Amino acid sequence: MNPNQKLFASSGIAIALGIINLLIGISNMSLNISLYSKGENHKSDNLTCTNINQNNTTMVNTYINNTTIIDKNTKMENPGYLLLNKSLCNVEGWVVIAKDNAIRFGESEQIIVTREPYVSCDPLSCKMYALHQGTTIRNKHSNGTTHDRTAFRGLISTPLGNPPTVSNSEFICVGWSSTSCHDGVSRMTICVQGNNENATATVYYNKRLTTTIKTWAKNILRTQESECVCHNSTCVVVMTDGPANNQAFTKVIYFHKGTIIKEEPLKGSAKHIEECSCYGHNQRVTCVCRDNWQGANRPVIEIDMNNLEHTSRYICTGVLTDTSRPKDKAIGECFNPITGSPGAPGIKGFGFLNENNTWLGRTISPKLRSGFEMLKIPNAGTDPDSKIKERQEIVGNDNWSGYSGSFIDYWNDNSECYNPCFYVELIRGRPEEAKYVEWTSNSLIALCGSPIPVGSGSFPDGAQIKYFS
């Protein structure tokens, strides 16, 4: 190729490149006009590209009117599965952290009728869970809500300390018996629904149905009525089916993301198990339960969350904590129920079995669901000779109480141990106050342990039921 041909060829290439650049420029101008016009009508419609590198650094590239804004943020890692690696904190007394006064508010506000409330926490907060009756206190449908199992019941949650209303309550699942717990990543919930002789448990994980469990004894399949506990992605639940006043059939069931990975029939010396109050510690779960058949002493289930195995026995102390119950005994029983008049049927309760710092809760009345007290009984879980060392009144005996159970905020990073907490249900209405109202509902108080001694006080429901007449 001679010099003139080379010159013409180079000129042609330059002209072609110039035309291409001109076309690209026109395209960019058209795109900018289009984006600007679209942004005027939809100012939030910006283009965003997010890239996450291996160091968990997030690069956010936001294109606004052809301008790139780069934000560099450190991504918060997922909290991960809960590991029960701490022991219980020592407690010298109990302080109230929440009291919802639901019945007092219910005299003039639209408060939902509930029973069987409990408290359960997640990495962000603690909430109250309760089984509603499909009505509010002032609604005529509240008549007859003393019945435990109806088609209108379901589990709701509300911010702890707030009385449950239609506007602040979140529906969880349909049923008349429940338990719920968070594994650090998401929440698992179980509700039992249906007929007494043919009930079904529905299991939800991350608010999605994952498993169903059909009755195995055709006699009121039921579960804890307080929170379950998880360790390293496995959540354990105690469920019972069978007679309330005779030999029943209890299972300890292990779940992963809402699906069953193992079942165990009840082992050990406990004769009857219902409504367990469970808490986690040292890679174990301890459940303090209700013997509705024979024992005024409470049965205990100890669960190894590494081996997924359990055993059962009774709290050893002769200080009895069920209701109704006979007089306290000088010597307790570790492996057999303590009977006597008045004895059965019983009430849901709890305890924290922490060797020398063991605390047990019970109604003050041995016969009625009234009053509530916490008793410090060193080594009550293992020593039949153990005696009451300290007593703290929570609700005076001239006021109604009800179910009680344990809970723990496992995500409280301010402590090197798990601070024990509990709640007390304050039942109002029928059957004790049938003279004034036709409904049964409750308010709730929640308390947590203090590392130093505390003062005194009584925290009753406080509503004047005659105002509802």
Curated annotation (Swiss-Prot):
Regulation: Inhibited by the neuraminidase inhibitors zanamivir (Relenza) and oseltamivir (Tamiflu). These drugs interfere with the release of progeny virus from infected cells and are effective against all influenza strains. Resistance to neuraminidase inhibitors is quite rare.
Cofactor section: Ca(2+)
GO molecular function: exo-alpha-sialidase activity; metal ion binding
UniProt: substrate binding residues: 115, 149, 274-275, 290, 369
Intravirion topological segments: 1-6
Taxonomy, superkingdom: Viruses
Residue ranges of the region described as Involved in apical transport and lipid raft association: 11-33
Cellular compartments per GO CC: host cell plasma membrane; membrane; virion membrane
Residues annotated to bind Ca(2+): 291, 295, 322
Signal peptide bounds: none
Keywords: Calcium, Disulfide bond, Glycoprotein, Glycosidase, Host cell membrane, Host membrane, Hydrolase, Membrane, Metal-binding, Signal-anchor, Transmembrane, Transmembrane helix, Virion
Reaction catalysed by this enzyme: Hydrolysis of alpha-(2->3)-, alpha-(2->6)-, alpha-(2->8)- glycosidic linkages of terminal sialic acid residues in oligosaccharides, glycoproteins, glycolipids, colominic acid and synthetic substrates
Residue intervals passing through the bilayer: 7-27
Residues covered by region (Hypervariable stalk region): 36-85
Cystines in this chain: 89-417, 121-126, 181-228, 230-235, 276-289, 278-287, 316-334, 421-448
Glycosylation sites: 28, 32, 46, 55-56, 65-66, 85, 143, 198, 232, 356, 399
Segments for region (Head of neuraminidase): 88-469
EC nos: 3.2.1.18
Active-site residues (renumbered): 148 (proton donor/acceptor), 403 (nucleophile)
An example Gene Ontology biological process: carbohydrate metabolic process
Function: Catalyzes the removal of terminal sialic acid residues from viral and cellular glycoconjugates. Cleaves off the terminal sialic acids on the glycosylated HA during virus budding to facilitate virus release. Additionally helps virus spread through the circulation by further removing sialic acids from the cell surface. These cleavages prevent self-aggregation and ensure the efficient spread of the progeny virus from cell to cell. Otherwise, infection would be limited to one round of replication.
Domain characteristics, as noted in the entry: Intact N-terminus is essential for virion morphogenesis. Possesses two apical sorting signals, one in the ectodomain, which is likely to be a glycan, and the other in the transmembrane domain. The transmembrane domain also plays a role in lipid raft association.
Something else known: The influenza A genome consist of 8 RNA segments. Genetic variation of hemagglutinin and/or neuraminidase genes results in the emergence of new influenza strains. The mechanism of variation can be the result of point mutations or the result of genetic reassortment between segments of two different strains.
Subunit structure: Homotetramer.
Family recorded in the similarity comment: Belongs to the glycosyl hydrolase 34 family.
Entry protein name: Neuraminidase
Phylogenetic lineage: Viruses, Riboviria, Orthornavirae, Negarnaviricota, Polyploviricotina
